[in-house]
Amino acid sequence: MLKGVENHSLPRTAAFFDLDKTVIAKSSTLTFSKSFYQGGLINRRAVLRTAYAQFVFLAGGADHDQMERMRAYLSALCRGWNVQQVKEIVAETLHDLIDPIIYDEAASLIEEHHTAGRDVVIVSTSGAEVVEPIGELLGADRVVATRMVVGDDGCFTGEVEYYAYGPTKAEAIRELAASEGYDLSRCYAYSDSATDVPMLESVGRPHAVNPDRALRREALARGWPILDFHRPVRLKQRIPGFSVPPRPALVAVAAIGAAAATAGLVWYANRRRANVA
């Protein structure tokens, strides 16, 4: 599937991975909804709505307009949430919640890319409080995600500084390539969503993973490889055992509140329910 070990006399390369339904089997942020409830960040009603949103997300996800509306909704809902508390909740529950839903196929690909000498970069609309710990768990070198403003009191102000979605993901990849010396024509990218077409077409070796219908059509039209990941498994249970080689500290290129992304999908669930009614 992959090219051999990198020729280090050539420019560096990287593999860019979307996170939800590409590396892990569920929405990373929605997976923490029960933990956020137990920590007092959301109420019981919101927990039920996030469960519904998880179902909707797995069934097909949100389109561009819905995701744009999520951005406005999440910023309002998360205003005043303590960032350190969110980080602590994620740290306490990360292995129990995320480890079991990592795709075995994705973990193998990450190993192969590292063995070949490529950097691994997680590129996600979800947040630093979720994505950075998952990146460390996987041995990723860098994380690109959305960024919300944090006030002097350590809480979200409700303002979105940077939204890692659609074309902005591709822009971040190009900026990272310029700063790190990646040759994008020889880089890889993986995603499940048609909203990530700009990211996929920014590299020379794009791959559709568990694609939604729109991305499947695009991949077939462009001749992009289509991969089927369907085996979530705990990393420590993989055979041979998954091992993360010693690597420099993960670099967060950008970040967002995990709770904020959860709130966005709560909004999406409400919208879908209203349409059905």
Curated annotation (Swiss-Prot):
GO MF annotations, alphabetized: hydrolase activity; metal ion binding
Pfam families given in the database record: HAD
InterPro entries per record: HAD-like_SerB, HAD-like_sf, HAD_hydro_SerB1, HAD_sf
Database matches in CDD domains: HAD_PGPPase
Binding residues annotated for Mg(2+), in chain numbering: D18, D20, D192
Keyword entries, A-Z: Hydrolase, Magnesium, Metal-binding
Similarity annotation: Belongs to the HAD-like hydrolase superfamily. SerB family.
NCBIfam families hit by this protein: HAD-SF-IB (TIGR01488), HAD-SF-IB-hyp1 (TIGR01490)
Protein name: Inhibition of morphological differentiation protein
Organism: Streptomyces azureus
